[in-house]
Amino acid sequence: MYNLKMEFTKSLIKGKLIKRYKRFFVDVQLNKEVVTAHCPNTGSMKGLLDQGNEVYLLKNDDPKRKLKYGLEIIKAQKNLVGVNTNMANKIVNHGLSNNLIKELKNNELIKPEVFFFKETRFDFFVEKGNQ
């Protein structure tokens, strides 16, 4: 297991999970206010969605967005779990680019989203020497 530190461009807002519904929505207690946030992960997230779990949201100031907040992280059993599926490749790219993944250190080439065949795409192509 790796501990990759990822920095967000905006400050995360801490709250308590109330519930998730309709796959895309979570209600969160922020101080004395209850807000509805966008849930970017439509998977079951079994074991993460317990009422009262600590969650971290990002505020979005885009007036075109229907919801002001987006769910980024859930704390479950002392672990912080990133739940925004849009961040997965950014986190891996950060780890590769900064030599944080020991098995893949000191690469000469890192290319995201490489097509090998017409319908086969890899998230990353990593090259070191002739490998």
PLM segments and residue spans:
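Conserved hydrophobic positions within beta-strands
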Residues: 15-17
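Short, charged beta-turn/beta-strand-edge "cap" motif at the junction between a beta-strand
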Residues: 19, 59-64
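Short aromatic-glycine-enriched beta-strand elements
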Residues: 22-27
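Short alpha-helix capping/helix-loop boundary micro-motifs
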Residues: 35-45
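Short nucleic-acid-contacting surface segments enriched for D/E, G, S/T with interspersed K/R
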Residues: 43-56
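Acidic-basic catalytic patches of nuclease active cores, encompassing PD-(D/E)XK
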Residues: 46, 80-110
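OB-fold/S1-family single-stranded nucleic acid-binding modules
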Residues: 62-79
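Active-site metal-binding core of divalent-cation-utilizing nuclease and nuclease-like domains
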Residues: 80, 84, 105-131
